[in-house]
Amino acid sequence: MKYKEIANNKEINAYLQKGNENLGQIGFTDHSKAHCVQVAHQAGKILKRMGYSEHEIELAKIAGYMHDIGNVINRTHHAEYGALLANDLLKETDMSLEDRITVIAAIGNHDESTGSPEDVISAALIIADKTDVRRSRVRQKEKSAYDIHDRVNYAVTDSKLKIAEDKSVIALNLQIDENICSMYDYFEIFLERMMLCRKSAEILGTTFKLTVNGRKVL
């Protein structure tokens, strides 16, 4: 089973689309196909850069693409719901049992409120997901109606995830407009997520660092 087959699967995409619509109704930022593709590609790039096998890269991309599928059921515990739903969907493919277990474990552990990185697949997924911070994820058109999540994402004017040549550091470098979002606001939303990225980097044998406006903050 290849990532491209998953990304073109009509049933999987229907669940993802409806989940994103559900989140829009309750005021969440964008979790559309663009986010799924971004997380999938970034998870794959992380493992490729760190020297993992093509097979592991494919599994990370599949987990990355499907990670938010549980939102179609409920936002609360969406990671766990997503793992169960993904298990049923992947049973209908030619994916081996071992690979299916790896993918659903990564999906089930990607949320900072309940999960933790268990292996390199889940670690890459977590870092890819939690570092997808960008202005285009804000759905609300009226700035006066922005909540803290909207402000934090809209404030990001540039976001780059880089891996050092010697693989010793995975660094998220952000530029934010502090007239829109204060550093306090950013950390209120993202501190727990960034700490999960740090744990994930350790699983990958490296270190996670965060800089905001050129200042090292983690």
Regions found by a protein language model. Give the residues of each.
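Non-transmembrane, amphipathic alpha-helical segments
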Residues: 28-31, 116, 189
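Post-HEXXH active-site segment of zinc metalloproteases
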Residues: 77-87, 98
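Histidine/acidic-rich helix-loop-helix segments that form or flank divalent-metal centers
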Residues: 96-157
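Short alpha-helical catalytic segment bearing the HExxH-like zincin motif
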Residues: 60, 64, 81, 107, ...
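Extended, compositionally biased eukaryotic interaction scaffolds
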Residues: 8, 17-24, 48, 52, ...
